[in-house]
Each structure stands twice: as C-alpha cells, then as structure tokens.
Amino acid sequence: MLVDGKLVCVTGAGGYIASWIVKLLLERGYTVRGTVRNPTDPKNNHLRELQGAKERLTLHSADLLDYEALCATIDGCDGVFHTASPMTDDPETMLEPAVNGAKFVIDAAAKAKVKRVVFTSSIGAVYMNPNRDTQAIVDENCWSDLDFCKNTKNWYCYGKMLAEQSAWETAKAKGVDLVVLNPVLVLGPPLQSAINASLVHILKYLTGSAKTYANLTQVYVDVRDVALGHVLVYEAPSASGRYILAETALHRGEVVEILAKFFPEYPLPTKCSDEKNPRAKPYKFTTQKIKDLGLEFKPIKQSLYESVKSLQEKGHLPLPQDSNQNEVIIES
C-alpha cells in the first residue's frame, strides 16, 4: 500500500522500534516528522540513511514534556505514532515523562485534528497479575495489577500501565481515535548503532559474562513485525482498542540452545541458575486480533540469528576466530 504525501509524526524516532517504523513508513510513501532529543546527534544518522529519508524525513527536537514543541511538530500531520518512552527502572525519571508525555502527545494530536494516534505500550501493562488463572489465555482484555507492580517495584510495568491508562483517558476526553500496541520482549536486528536494552540479555550469554541462564520463560517478537503491526493498525479503518504482538514463548534454556546451535563458537552457558525448582512455564496468549489484520510473525529463531549477526556487524560482539561465515538455514 503506497500513500504518497501522507504526513505522520513518529515520537522517539531514533529508538529501536521507532526506527523500523520510520523505515517502513518511508518505504510505503509517507512523509515523516520524527522527534528526537537532538536532531544533529550522529546517533540519528541511521535515520538519514534510510531510503526516502532525504526527500520525506525531517527530524525535530521535541521533549515529551515540552507541549508547545510537540504541538508544533504534530501540527498538520494526518497521524501520530507515539513510541517515545524512557527505558529505566527509576520511578523518579520514568513516570512523569511516560505518563504526562502520553497525555501531551494526545492533547497535541487532538489540537491538530489527526486521523489516528498509534501508541506503543507493552505486554507489561497486560499480564502482570498474580491473581490471574495460570491456565487462562492472556488477551487484549487483560490488565496488569497496578498495586502488584508497585509493591514489587516493577517500575517499568507500573509506568507502562499508567502511561497507557493516561493515553486512553486523554483520548476519550479529547475525542481522539487511539489504537494501542502491546508488544512482548522485542528481538531482531537494530537499525541504530547503539545496543538496545532488549538485546542485552542475548549479548551477555554470547560474551560469557553470564555463566548460567535464569529459570525464566519469556515471550518474544521480532522488531520488524512490531513495526509492521503499528503501520497495519494505523492504515486499517476497522482497527480499534489494543493489540498484543507476540510470536512464541521460550525458556531461557531454549534461547541458549538455539544460540548454541547457530553460534557454537561462543561460550554460551549450559546450566540454569535455579536447578531446584521446576522449569518455569510460559503464560498462554492469543494474537488472533493482529493476525486478522494480516500480520504473519517471523519465527523467533530467525530473529535470534539475525540479532546476533547484526551485533557482530555493528561491533558489539567480536567475531570468533574460527567462525564459519556460511549462511545458516533456519527451520521454523
């Protein structure tokens, strides 16, 4: 679908997910205004190198708490992708920009009379509930338990939930068409040069800094599928509410087994840090809602392989001396 000339804003455009959203939007013919902390910072050069960026991408300095700057950037746009969010577990530095930032962006979108706002939330706003039946299927109707997140000092999930609630409340009050994406842990090759938080636990296994793996199960999704999910819900007139983005659940032991198969030269751990308790089981989830819009998820094995290749290419992970550089056939 090509939509030449349509103008959209992407907040936090230099981020892991946002960079792929910008890339996809440019490929589909959109004109993009991206907000970043500093438009001249070399760390945003990867955006300028994207196909179509020279003609249809401009970068703007707009802090999440600078309402006037947000209004100026969003004015004239047909839609907004609000992906910017602080990645920290420090409540003092995270909560205000996450919550008020969501409010300010939607306020600015309402003022500009945009067609739709697509908001990047998280599975952290969905599944953190100790009272949920372990056999129950997690879907878009589920919400995390705010008190549980606060009492366990899970400030990331706490902040994501407050920010999403703020977004819904503001959108309702202002009459803004809001659609929310709730991705799980995101993997896949980054476009930016800096390593992002979600790839750190992969890197620590490969470098040998982690001698064991945790008795932990997580659900994963590819960053390119997350980006496509954002664009699909923006373009589909019928899209509404929340959308979980998730491909498959893996125990950390399965993650290191997959990595060891693809990259046996690295000192990957072979033991679990918790050998007393039963192996952690994943929660059950459904992604039928986003699949109904046409999204087909990439296998996470492919995401893991391409994540590591990208870490090698960007210099975050040294190439083993005896590395076999032949391409690997990835079975789904």
Swiss-Prot record:
Active site: 160 (proton donor)
Pathways involved: Aromatic compound metabolism; phenylpropanoid biosynthesis
Covalent S-S links between cysteines: 149-157
Tissues expressing this chain: Expressed at low levels in leaves, stems and flowers.
Induction behaviour: By the bacterial pathogen X.campestris.
Catalyzed chemical reaction(s): (E)-cinnamaldehyde + NADP(+) + CoA = (E)-cinnamoyl-CoA + NADPH + H(+)
Keywords from the named record: Disulfide bond, NADP, Oxidoreductase, Plant defense
Entry GO MF terms: cinnamoyl-CoA reductase activity
GO process terms (BP): circadian rhythm; defense response; negative regulation of circadian rhythm; phenylpropanoid biosynthetic process; response to cold
Signal peptide coordinates: none
Binding site for NADP(+): 12-18, 37, 43, 63-64, 83-85, 156, 160, 183-186, 198
E.C. number(s) listed in UniProt: 1.2.1.44
Annotated family: Belongs to the NAD(P)-dependent epimerase/dehydratase family. Dihydroflavonol-4-reductase subfamily.
Protein role: Cinnamoyl-CoA reductase probably involved in the formation of phenolic compounds associated with the hypersensitive response. Seems not to be involved in lignin biosynthesis.
Record's protein name: Cinnamoyl-CoA reductase 2
